[in-house]
Amino acid sequence: MATVTLLTDEQLAPEAAAVFADIRATRGTDYINNFWRALAHDPALLARTWAQLKVVMGPGQLSPQVKEMLYLAVSIAHGCDYCIHSHTAAARAKGMGEAELMELMAIVGMAAQTNRMVAGLGVPVVEVFKR
């Protein structure tokens, strides 16, 4: 259950409506997901978050699929169910197959396990890793 009302297009402040228009234009779709509809209560936060996301997830050294898979891995680590589903769908839309998803899950699971072991054991960082 949402802790805020998910705003419809008709309920948007003009500043939020402008951000929604940019999301639609950038993504080439009329669909606006619930995350943006929740953030629309604060048009400045909505605009700032969208601007940052466009830069981070835009063209760069990593492929769009890899970026979505990384976003998915972090979403799993943080236990964000909405984000897990959203970024799984986005990664699949950018070419991720079942085998890649399963390999990603194995990596996320292994990293979580060994991270907890290292933290619990207080293993000191090896000097060569500090470069």
Tell what function each PLM region has.
Residues 1-131:
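Hydrophobic alpha-helical segments
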